[in-house]
Curated annotation (Swiss-Prot):
Its main location: membrane. Residues 243-266 are annotated as: Essential for determining substrate specificity. This is Lipoprotein lipase. The modification 3'-nitrotyrosine is found at residues 121, 191, 343. Changing residue 183 to G/N: Loss of enzyme activity with triolein and tributyrin. Disulfide bonds join 54-67, 243-266, 291-310, 302-305, 445-465. The gene is LPL. GO terms for cellular component: catalytic complex; cell surface; chylomicron; extracellular region; extracellular space; plasma membrane; very-low-density lipoprotein particle. Detected in blood plasma. Detected in milk (at protein level). It comes from Homo sapiens (Human).
Amino acid sequence: MESKALLVLTLAVWLQSLTASRGGVAAADQRRDFIDIESKFALRTPEDTAEDTCHLIPGVAESVATCHFNHSSKTFMVIHGWTVTGMYESWVPKLVAALYKREPDSNVIVVDWLSRAQEHYPVSAGYTKLVGQDVARFINWMEEEFNYPLDNVHLLGYSLGAHAAGIAGSLTNKKVNRITGLDPAGPNFEYAEAPSRLSPDDADFVDVLHTFTRGSPGRSIGIQKPVGHVDIYPNGGTFQPGCNIGEAIRVIAERGLGDVDQLVKCSHERSIHLFIDSLLNEENPSKAYRCSSKEAFEKGLCLSCRKNRCNNLGYEINKVRAKRSSKMYLKTRSQMPYKVFHYQVKIHFSGTESETHTNQAFEISLYGTVAESENIPFTLPEVSTNKTYSFLIYTEVDIGELLMLKLKWKSDSYFSWSDWWSSPGFAIQKIRVKAGETQKKVIFCSREKVSHLQKGKAPAVFVKCHDKSLNKKSG
């Protein structure tokens, strides 16, 4: 009996060692399957948003446990862009911190492809395919090894990183939930086919912020054409307030892209800071409006929210998937918080004599129940007798419900003999205003039935009309 028991025990030990050996071989084989992946996947923590202290290693299941990956929460993967220094830029920990503040239980992974991103731009642009493949293989491994749902994955790519995110999304076994493109790079991608860049097919939902599209197509820092389900162009997308456009253009013209790193950061990186703003100021999201062109938007013709014509910028965007990409526009402040309040103003200029003036400067002041915004400048390319003009203005503060406005026609900066002999003027009876954020329409009437607006003279005053049927909420 003792010999039999010894035999059984020996056999059990042998089988256990054989199983362990095979398991070790299988684990080694799995590691070998991913040995060619050069990108690194650092799971940062809320306590240390600036350092890559723990890496998730494809093929090494133990690394996922070691890094305390939360399998029941959503995962953000941050993919940086081209770098001159070969180091992370200052926005990376800021975005990581904002993501954790908004989603404390989430996983925030920073994808490190710095060794490839510091090459000459065309070389790094070509590497986005390899980076995209690395990211896709990592995501597929997480799904296959741990049954992690791709519906919990949100990729955020900046500049070249946006295209790497798109390529990754096109190669995953199932679609990831969302890709956010933060001013996707333009050179080498403006005319590229969809498989080689970010496109709407790369995720269940793709939203894009375009913040530095100034220049001819293919030469602008950020891509100009829409590449998502919703493409938002803050301030027209060409350049951002608070950034020195003249200096950036001069340096690009004189030295090319190589020395422009610091200058392009302002508008290019504004896409990141707008998204960070949406994470930190969730109760006051910036509103963007669908429009056929930035010119139409500047006329105030697009402040409608009917049938998904407006949307939130950033994290709280409504996932609208139209057949065609939706181009949306908004104005912003020059610093965080970036939210402004949009208004369409419509004025009919009347008169007994035919007059036409070009490039005329005006100021409008709005007074509301909460605050006021005075002397907002705007220019009308043309003002003619008996014509109605629509234009967009915005305020940096919430003035509440509109009560009164003042309109001033400014003098020319140069001396005009015709203005010296006689002051041009128009008769204005009503001014119509629509608030984009509240969708409320208000009609203002002259205090004296008709106001006579004269160039260089005192402003005309208009108060909210008493007829309630004139003032209503609109979509």
